[in-house]
Amino acid sequence: ITFAATPTAESILGSMRKSMLAKPAVEAKFTINGGQGPVQGTICIEGAKFAMATPQLKVWYDGKTQWTYLASTGEVSITEPTADELAASNPFAILSGYETRYKARKLTDSNGRRRVELQPRAKDTGFEKIIVIADTAGKWPQAINIYFDDGRQISLVIDHITGAANQPAKLFRYD
């Protein structure tokens, strides 16, 4: 009789990160719950770069500079975000810095999914905790719940996620 080892929080996060790096890019459709109610969007991630779109905003990040377009004002803001600011605009970025930036702890789940709670090691991140929920195989994230220090909560539910081919560099830059 062989028993499979119970996955640790770190192995669950590592498995998701490995799945996200197995192809040159990752494309996902998601729903954000919190704030102004449910908002659907798409994201394409390639390494540290990403492009995200919802009806309210569009965000491009080329690995250094982030452009955020707000549909309500028609204005674009340009920043060079910190790691914490990136995690707020792209919750998938949490998976790339979990080893050094968060303390990870495995949580139980009655639906057989794999859940990990991340608590920031630094005090000034703006986050109280983040809960990442993986599929039953632990390969892909299904949801990322962010709890902010000020009591706000945002839930990012991943409706569909898949590996993708290399993307043109212009996809990650505002033009």
Predicted regions and their residues:
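A generic structural motif
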Residues: T31-N33, A53, Y69-A71, Q119-R121, ...
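Flexible, surface-exposed loop/linker segments and immediately adjacent secondary-structure boundaries
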Residues: P81-G112
